[in-house]
Amino acid sequence: MRNTDRKMWFFLGSGDIILINFAFVLAYFLKFDTIELKENYIFLLLVFNFSWILVSAMFSLYTFSRVDHLEHIVSNTIKAGVTHALIITALLFSIKASEQFSRQLILYTYIIDFIVVILWRFVALAFIKRYRVSGYNYRRVV
């Protein structure tokens, strides 16, 4: 992995994780009128984060070339989001924990998450494109 790929992974990956956590806490607030998470919901949030990391690695969300079209990047992000939702649903039903968690909270989380992650991708890719056009990504060779 090149140094620039690691920076890109950190930049986009940390943004995704922060937004997933934001979406979860906002959905929790909308459902329960508090941001103080119960212990079982903290566990669910950790599962959300770890499964997103695995899904993003499966779909190579953080490695793209300069010629990738925005539609391709967004479609991969949507596919990863759907796969993430399927993994979370399967996991909750397999451990018989689906009764412990609010389905409305999970639905709110995914609605908010899809919106903010797609917007984040647009903003981040526009920033990266502007950064590259400005010439800051060139290495100085002596």
Please place each PLM-identified region on the residue numbering.
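Signature of alpha-helical transmembrane segments in polytopic membrane proteins
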Residues: 1-137
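Conserved hydrophobic helix-helix packing surfaces used for dimerization/oligomerization
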Residues: 141-142
